[in-house]
Amino acid sequence: MPAPRYKSGSAKKVYKRAPGNRRVLHIRRKKQSSAKCGACGALLNGVPSLRTVQVSKLSKTQRRPERAFGGALCPKCVKKMMVVKARNY
């Protein structure tokens, strides 16, 4: 019987071959999906695709780019938004 923490559907199940030609179930954590732009859905560069615990151990500059809306919007959307805001100001 697996431990309760391994019975989750979010755990990735991998079968490995052990000595004696046995198949053994190994349970791994799934990979985190990449960060996406909030406006257009494009993949964000400079943002690591790690789990929350691992991201919290990184320094602040390694977590997201140091520009306006870094880690939330892609550069194209930021540029568009700034142009629109400047024209409406």
From Swiss-Prot:
It comes from the Archaea. GO terms for molecular function: structural constituent of ribosome. Gene3D superfamilies: 6.20.340.10. Coiled coil: none annotated. One of its GO terms (biological process) is translation. InterPro entries: Ribosomal_eL34 (IPR008195), Ribosomal_eL34_C_sf (IPR038562), Ribosomal_L34e_arc-type (IPR047868). One of its GO terms (cellular component) is ribonucleoprotein complex. Pfam families: Ribosomal_L34e (PF01199). The keyword Ribonucleoprotein applies. Keywords: Ribonucleoprotein, Ribosomal protein. Belongs to the eukaryotic ribosomal protein eL34 family. This is Large ribosomal subunit protein eL34. It comes from Methanococcus vannielii (strain ATCC 35089 / DSM 1224 / JCM 13029 / OCM 148 / SB).
